[in-house]
């Protein structure tokens, strides 16, 4: 039987796309390498996702938001950009929610909660039949022609569909198998992520702190359920070789180290989760489409996390592609026509290019330690604090309403 659509990857992007297509009449199958248990009940991975107001609206439409649970959604009211260490002349720029039409700039939700909600929304009760989800499957080959796309699985089975969509991460093997090149930038840094409690309140404010030799981020979470103390997701970015010693430290030593790195500004910080590390690599696929093929989410554009736009941009790609597919199907047109795929590519690349380039520029500038770079970034923060129209533009970008 020929399928309408095969989505490779049942992470948040693939599952959200499958959910967006429910009730459209399209026959959709998801292929995932992980086990069904890992997809249904994803493990905590340390990552908190900053969601714009626009992304929250899309997630409500897809039925994900109501499945997250109120206690798993933390409001992000303000953002604070810092440059320079404690005890030095530290530059600050505050982006207030008062610069936006909403009572908060956005929201913070743990990645594993988003993954769980996406599975429940895609596979649970809802409009139209659920897609087919096949776990423990690996794609070993892909061929396309004017009529169909054919995927070969590790088991030797061949599947045929009118369109294949890659949603299998920024290191997408499906994209690579289609011969699509990608510009990849290794920033030479790894981020360590974990949850920590602290006695001083975070005031629902996210920090992005560009200190000398390190970058720190603080993402405000809801209070710790065990102690009631303020709790934050902590992100420490260092050169690759400097992360492992922090992962190997016992909890007491790690708490001391992180309290010191934050200059004691939050009081004594205490670990409240496992620690995780992720190398930072930016990816820009040179093409998002090919014959009977499209890429979404990180498989299309993999962002550096410094501007917190990765998942939000991925949701935008899903919204753009799903609407085009549904419209074509309802009009009796080919869902993988070259014209449709080219329009999707142009629309999403236009939406992503400026953000990707700006994010890359910021990430590059703030990893350089020579004196001119320090002067430049300090000057940018100080100028931004004085220039309200710039802060208003940043607030619009953070909310996704700009």
What are these regions (language model features)?
Residues 3-30:
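N-terminal Rossmann-like FAD-binding beta1-loop-alpha1 element of flavoenzymes
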Residues 57, 171-207, 214-216, 238-242, ...:
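Central beta-strand plus flanking loop segment that forms part of the substrate or channel wall
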